[in-house]
């Protein structure tokens, strides 16, 4: 009994101090310059009164371009187990909620876009990309608002989609069953992708130029 109490108190203090350090994170603080990563952000209340941001991030992503004639689409995926929030208990809960045992990969497949749409996005610096997000064996139609910018010769795609756990039919993650932290039904999906890391893009550009 005393050992269980010590474990509980240790977890409480750990998450308490973690919450003090992770309040109100913006996307610029989540991703480092030059990273090729994805993340989620949600909000939780720690010990009933401390509001804190929770961020789970992965840089183990696969991004590739698929072409059909002059049209292209983009496929981005990552293993659920690669999401890291800095708290093992929370990450294990997320793995269970997202059914990682049976469907270990989350994948987004965009709709096909034309070359004119790509050029327009690069010129304007903003676009919306529609497609399907595959999570836990289910598919969800999504519309991602994105920004495109060039940094030191590298094009970067960033974006934030505001949604909720209930939109995906998911339970809310909780630390120690909600004793330590309760998560709100709020979810941000964050994108920070380097176009030079998108497989097949350079080959498609070279082929287009040669034609």
Residue ranges, per PLM feature:
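Bacterial N-terminal signal peptides that target proteins for export
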Residues: 1-9
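Intrinsic disorder/low-complexity segments enriched in polar/small residues
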Residues: 3-4, 22-24
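Generic alpha-helix initiation/capping and coil-helix boundary signal
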Residues: 3-4, 15, 56
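Bacterial N-terminal signal peptides
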Residues: 9-21
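Low-complexity, acidic/polar, glycine-enriched regions of mature
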Residues: 23-211
């Amino acid at each position: 009994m005393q050992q269980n109490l010590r474990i509980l108190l240790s977890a409480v203090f750990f998450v308490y101090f973690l919450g003090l350090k992770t309040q109100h994170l913006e996307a610029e603080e989540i991703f480092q310059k030059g990273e090729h990563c994805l993340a989620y952000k949600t909000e939780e209340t720690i010990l009933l009164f401390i509001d804190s941001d929770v961020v789970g991030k992965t840089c183990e992503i696969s991004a590739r371009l698929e072409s059909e004639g002059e049209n292209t689409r983009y496929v981005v995926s990552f293993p659920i187990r690669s999401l890291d929030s800095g708290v093992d208990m929370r990450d294990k809960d997320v793995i269970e909620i997202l059914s990682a045992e049976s469907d270990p990969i989350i994948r987004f497949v965009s709709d096909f876009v034309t070359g004119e749409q790509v050029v327009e996005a690069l010129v304007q610096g903003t676009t919306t990309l529609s497609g399907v997000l595959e999570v836990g064996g289910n598919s969800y139609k999504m519309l991602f608002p994105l920004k495109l910018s060039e940094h030191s010769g590298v094009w970067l795609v960033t974006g934030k989609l505001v949604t909720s756990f209930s939109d995906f039919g998911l339970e809310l993650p909780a630390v120690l069953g909600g004793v330590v932290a309760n998560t709100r039904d709020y979810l941000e999906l964050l994108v920070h992708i380097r176009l030079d890391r998108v497989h097949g893009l350079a080959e498609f550009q070279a082929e287009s130029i040669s034609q």
